[in-house]
């Protein structure tokens, strides 16, 4: 058993080599399919991934979004993924015989009377045995070929033929059946469960059984969850004893067979990248359910609900029933007034008035409450109105019909979905408009690059022999975006993304405007029983006219928006692609592959530039080849044409020589020779070089050809930029322009503006650019706080020393006074680190542990400072008499760092300036009150004597314990209310105190940072003494 994994690995390697060798067979129809098959057949897991890529959702009949797949993996980790990749339900090769046409078709749904589910689980163990047998058969075929000399490839192909039934375990189980399949030691748990009208096979998770693959149960079961009145016990819908329902709603387009609005639109779409059509289809189905019945999803099914109670769920029907008596009263009043008019006139009115009278009554009745279509019936369900039968279908289909005429009128042939080779079902014909929009957006954003690459290279010759990786429709902005991202230049990024963002913004506005117009038409249509009767009287006729005008405006506004978009796209096409024409290729069985048992095929129309120059005139071909878009999208072809043109210009015919390529004579045939073409004749083609004077030493001819390419590129760029500028400015007024043209309401207030996405993206890019610029500036300064400090005053230690807080460049917390030094701990208190004036007495060091000191110690041993710095402006202060708590400790290095980083709040919170005095001042010191207060030495700058400066701000009103201003203004009372004047006076006082605090803090910060200038050099000792007295007395006057 130890050798089993190694043997299995060898078998897999051999199978891969042999499978890859089969691809060299000449009769391989498609190399890509063969490679995918080779990779797919290695293990059960790779087969599961391959089936997802080629045949969507082969493990289930009910399509689920990718979000469900992600959530299930979280609910059932490992188990769900293993079961998901090995499970097969929608597989014709396994179940085609038992279920003709596919297990997922409507005919092959689960029978409610005999409820069972058939599914298969892939076994790697059986697959390894099948591969081993294939290896043996291949070896025998090779040996036979050696002996007989025949070709062994047919036998090898037959040996490796993929027969899924050989390595799949097939199960047919009913609900609540469960089991375990062991695959190479890994258990695969499964259980069959019933979920409403579905039968599923699942695995175990944290929440119980997690469904993995499901299929529907046949209708009706036992009461339809889609049509509430469809019941097998209702004999009105049964015509035979087999309980076969004949309900007309059983086969409507939005029944269970349709797969929902998203799937219906996706299946009907003909573009490679589907974006907008599912949204529009879902909106249309919602409107149909709202206006007709919840059981239908299209106006084509309106006849299915005639004389049916399901109309009760219609909002329009309910409003019509409620307005029935009011409309009848309006009609009665109109008849009475018309009769009174005839009686008062005294003569018979003309016949046209009788005709207008009758037509008005019929019009109002038909479009407001409906006409009875069943003679003798009084049921409101028998009434059919003109809004449902005529107005809504005309308006809603007209929105898309008028716009599609403009959208498909592309001169270049790009994204035209109304050609003879493509057709839509009548119920989804409107999707041609949204396919054209999706195709345009995908083409300009480069979302269709991969599909165009494969189609253009493979479907021409059905192989990769002439594969050109560089020939795909990459939008030109990609070539600007790549260097912009690499260089980090946000200006290039903005320039590169300007046009795609504008395309996205205008496209989003078109979709939003169309949806808003459809919803607005629905709202106005529901109110038809209220506005239509106003048509009867001249006094209320204006309301009816406004109602009709709004309906028509909402019908035409999307067409105006589409006209603008197609104009913008056409100018863009001409600016970037010149006169290039696009060719389309209809792909059958496209990337999605066969869905639901190979019974459905989605055709995709892919567009690419037609490079068959025989279809162009000479002028159009040159315009296309010299366009910026063609050169960027086809670099190999452009380089080849450039080299060919250069050779033709260098190796040209002689001037004034008549050439005939078909002539037999070599001289007449004009075989090109080097140097025969003159420089003058070459330069004559370029008008912008007409002023060049030829002379000896002119440059070679071939580089001169670059002028033409550069000229074409610059002209294309200028045209594109000018187009972008015009369209950007015009798009800002697009909503108002459309409203003015149709005399309606502008949608700019209720819909996304045409420039919304563009402006938001540009603002994000600008913010990113500012952030990048800030990082660059920070990096240029060294990226560290030391450099920042150096630029603002030298080294950290020098700044501390110069401020009185450090003893050298090392930043140590030592302080010098008269040749004696006091050494404190690393985290010195503010009094020891910043106020050494009050701690050195008589040249003796004061212990740092002392907690009770005099605020003003002896001044006899201190000499006056020669150039004191001006003190900050004082605010209202108050000095207490006792020290209640020891001030928090702070190091000088922290003070410097906070100063350099402009952190005023941290500084004010760390420097506790509350200093109180417990002991009385000694008598010896009281005898000399006139002696001025001085600093240590001239080495200590007076600007950091913060005992005085910070003492000024310690009792400002509104400060909390962290020294932050917390007082807030109150604006609860309004003008005229009691207490309003007192409130405003208090607010003014708070503003004054806040301003004083901010001013004092700023001056204190400048003093600590050493940036305040020396403005007090003229002050004498008396000024300092007066300053001390004012502080001691609590005065709030400024010195």
Curated annotation (Swiss-Prot):
Residues 812-836 have a biased composition (Low complexity). This is Uncharacterized protein RBE_1265. Its main location: membrane. Belongs to the TrbL/VirB6 family. Keywords: Cell membrane, Membrane, Signal, Transmembrane, Transmembrane helix. GO terms for cellular component: plasma membrane. Residues 802-811 have a biased composition (Gly residues). Residues 1-28 form the signal peptide. It is found in: Cell membrane.
């Amino acid at each position: 058993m130890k050798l089993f994994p190694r043997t299995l690995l060898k078998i897999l390697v051999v199978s891969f080599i042999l499978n890859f060798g089969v691809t060299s067979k000449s009769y391989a129809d498609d190399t890509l399919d063969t490679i995918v098959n080779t990779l797919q057949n290695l293990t059960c897991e790779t087969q599961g991934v391959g089936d997802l890529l080629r045949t969507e959702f082969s493990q289930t009949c009910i399509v689920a979004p990718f979000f469900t797949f992600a959530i299930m993996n979280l609910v059932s980790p490992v188990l769900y993924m293993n079961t998901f990749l090995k499970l097969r339900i929608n597989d014709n090769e396994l179940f085609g015989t038992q279920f003709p046409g596919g297990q997922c078709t409507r005919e092959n749904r689960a029978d409610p009377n005999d409820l069972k589910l058939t599914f298969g689980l892939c076994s790697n163990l059986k697959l390894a045995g099948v591969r081993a047998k294939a290896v043996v058969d291949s070896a025998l075929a090779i040996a036979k070929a050696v002996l007989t000399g025949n070709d062994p490839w047919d036998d090898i192909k037959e040996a490796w033929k993929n027969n899924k039934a050989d390595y799949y375990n097939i199960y047919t189980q009913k609900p609540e059946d469960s089991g375990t399949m062991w695959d190479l030691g890994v258990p695969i748990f499964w259980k069959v469960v019933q979920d409403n009208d579905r039968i599923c096979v699942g695995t175990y998770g944290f929440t119980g059984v997690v469904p993995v693959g499901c299929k529907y149960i046949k209708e009706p079961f036992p009461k339809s969850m889609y049509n509430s009145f469809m019941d097998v016990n209702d004999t009105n819908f049964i015509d035979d004893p087999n309980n076969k329902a004949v309900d007309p709603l059983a086969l409507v387009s939005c029944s269970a067979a349709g797969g929902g609005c998203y799937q219906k639109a996706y299946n009907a779409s003909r573009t490679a990248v589907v974006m907008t059509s599912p949204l529009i289809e879902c909106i249309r189905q919602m409107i149909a359910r709202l206006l007709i019945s919840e059981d239908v999803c299209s106006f084509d099914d309106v006849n299915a609900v005639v004389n049916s109670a399901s109309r009760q769920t219609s909002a329009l029907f309910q409003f019509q029933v409620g307005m029935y008596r009011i409309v009848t009263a309006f009609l009665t009043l109109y008849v009475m007034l018309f009769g009174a008019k005839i009686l008062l006139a005294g003569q018979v009115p003309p016949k046209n008035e009788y005709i207008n009278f009758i037509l008005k009554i019929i019009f109002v009745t038909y479009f407001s409450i409906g006409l009875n279509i069943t003679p003798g019936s009084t049921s409101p369900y028998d009434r059919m109105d003109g809004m449902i039968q005529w107005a809504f279908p005309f308006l809603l289909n007209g929105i898309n019909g008028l716009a599609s005429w403009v959208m498909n009128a592309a001169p270049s042939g790009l994204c035209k979905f109304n050609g003879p080779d493509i057709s839509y079902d009548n119920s989804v014909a409107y999707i041609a408009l949204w396919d054209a929009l999706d195709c345009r957006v995908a083409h300009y954003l480069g979302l269709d690059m991969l599909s165009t690459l494969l189609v253009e290279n493979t479907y021409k010759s059905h192989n990769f022999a002439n594969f050109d990786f560089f020939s795909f429709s990459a939008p030109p902005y990609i070539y600007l975006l790549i260097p912009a991202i690499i260089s980090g230049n946000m200006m290039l990024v903005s320039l590169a993304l300007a046009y795609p963002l504008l395309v996205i913004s205008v496209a989003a506005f078109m979709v939003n405007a169309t949806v808003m117009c459809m919803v607005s038409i629905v709202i106005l249509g529901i109110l038809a029983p209220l506005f239509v009767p106003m048509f009867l009287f001249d006094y209320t006729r204006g309301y009816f006219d406004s109602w009709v005008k709004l309906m028509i405006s909402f019908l035409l506004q999307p067409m105006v928006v589409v006209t603008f978009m197609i104009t913008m796209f056409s100018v863009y096409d001409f600016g970037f692609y010149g006169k290039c024409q696009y060719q389309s290729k209809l792909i059958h069985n496209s990337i999605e592959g066969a869905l639901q048992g190979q019974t459905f095929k989605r055709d995709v129309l892919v567009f690419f530039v037609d490079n068959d120059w025989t279809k162009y005139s000479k002028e159009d071909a040159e315009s296309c080849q010299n366009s910026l878009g063609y050169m960027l999208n086809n670099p190999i072809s452009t380089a080849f044409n450039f080299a060919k043109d250069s050779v033709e210009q260098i190796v040209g015919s002689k001037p004034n020589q008549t050439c005939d390529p078909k002539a037999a004579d070599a001289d007449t045939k004009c075989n090109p020779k080097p140097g025969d073409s003159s420089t003058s004749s070459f330069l004559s083609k370029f008008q912008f070089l007409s002023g060049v004077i030829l002379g000896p030493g002119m440059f070679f001819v071939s580089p001169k050809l670059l002028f033409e390419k550069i000229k074409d590129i610059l002209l294309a760029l200028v045209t594109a930029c000018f187009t972008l500028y015009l369209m950007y400015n015009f798009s800002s007024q697009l909503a108002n322009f459309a409203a003015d043209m149709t005399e309606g309401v502008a949608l700019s207030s209720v819909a996304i503006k045409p420039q919304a996405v563009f402006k938001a993206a540009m603002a994000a890019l600008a913010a990113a650019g500012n952030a990048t610029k800030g990082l660059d500036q920070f990096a240029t300064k060294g990226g560290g706080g030391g450099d920042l400090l150096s630029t603002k005053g030298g080294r950290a230690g020098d700044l501390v020393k110069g401020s009185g807080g450090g003893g050298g460049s090392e930043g140590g917390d030592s302080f010098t006074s008269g040749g004696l030094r006091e050494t404190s701990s690393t985290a010195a208190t503010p009094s020891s680190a910043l106020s050494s004036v009050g701690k050195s007495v008589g040249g003796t060091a004061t212990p740092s542990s002392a907690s009770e000191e005099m605020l003003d110690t002896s001044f006899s041993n201190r000499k006056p400072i020669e150039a004191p710095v001006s003190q900050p402006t004082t605010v209202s202060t108050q000095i207490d008499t006792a020290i209640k708590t020891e001030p928090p400790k702070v190091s000088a290095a922290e003070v410097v760092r906070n100063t350099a980083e402009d952190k005023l709040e941290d500084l004010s919170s760390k420097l506790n300036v509350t200093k109180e005095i417990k002991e009385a001042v000694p008598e010896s010191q009281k005898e000399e009150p006139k002696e001025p207060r001085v600093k240590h030495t001239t080495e200590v700058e007076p600007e950091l004597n913060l005992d005085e400066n910070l003492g000024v701000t310690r009792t400002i009103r509104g400060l909390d314990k962290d020294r932050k201003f917390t007082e807030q203004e109150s604006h609860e009372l309004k003008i005229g209310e009691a207490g309003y004047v007192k409130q405003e006076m208090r607010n003014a006082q708070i503003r004054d105190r806040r301003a004083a605090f901010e001013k004092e803090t700023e001056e204190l910060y400048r003093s600590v940072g050493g940036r305040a200038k020396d403005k007090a050099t003229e002050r004498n000792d008396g000024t300092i003494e007066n300053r001390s007295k004012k502080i001691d007395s609590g005065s709030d006057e400024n010195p």
